[in-house]
Design a protein with these regions (language model features):
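C-terminal substrate-binding/catalytic lobe of Rossmann-fold NAD(P)-dependent oxidoreductases
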Residues: 56-174
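Rossmann-fold NAD(P)-binding glycine/threonine-rich loop
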Residues: 1-4, 9-32, 38-50
């Protein structure tokens, strides 16, 4: 890090790479997020509130959509959303990816994650909370890749001059 604050936005880091970031944060400010969009991170905060308010009585499905050139499925952002929900629920959920091979009723502890790839979709994430008589859908739609650059700039401004430590979008949003 050469004594400079770091802003890291990447998915798929190994445990060793994550450990190196943690170690670097003892010397310099390290800001880490799998998605730099402020809107996605607000969506995550809203999902955590919804999990608390619905108390496990609602089924949860995440549907993410991206352009046809995106390599990973599900996206790192979809997994970030799922992990935030599951952490808030005390690890109660098991992830089920798509359902094309599942031939049984949905289990209460399932958290469904589905991926769609097509055209030039920058990034859409829908989180469905489905109850027996009503449902709530929370959605984020990135209409341009500029939102990720804007978030990265805000993250850089946030860590500039801060003490060494490991910072996330939750810190920036507070």
């Amino acid at each position: 890090a050469h004594g400079l604050p770091c802003v890291i936005c990447s998915t798929g880091l190994s445990a060793g790479e994550e450990a190196r970031l943690e170690a670097a944060s003892e010397q310099v400010p390290v800001f880490r997020s799998a998605n730099m969009s402020l809107g996605v991170n607000v969506l995550i905060e809203l999902c955590k509130q919804a999990v608390t308010l619905f108390g496990g009585e609602f089924d949860i499905e995440i549907v993410e959509k991206h352009h046809h050139n995106k390599l990973d499925a599900p996206s790192g952002t979809a997994l970030m959303i799922a992990d935030a929900i599951n952490t808030r629920a005390g690890g109660a959920y098991e992830y089920v990816y798509d359902r094309h091979e599942v031939r049984q009723p949905r289990g209460r502890q399932e958290l469904g994650i589905s991926a769609v790839r097509g055209g030039g979709i920058v990034g859409d994430h829908d989180v469905l909370f489905c109850g027996p008589e009503e449902g709530v859908t929370l959605r984020h739609r990135a209409q341009s890749r500029g939102v990720f650059a804007d978030g990265a700039v805000q993250a850089a401004l946030f860590v500039d001059g801060r003490a060494p430590g490991y910072y996330t979008m939750s810190d920036l949003l507070r």
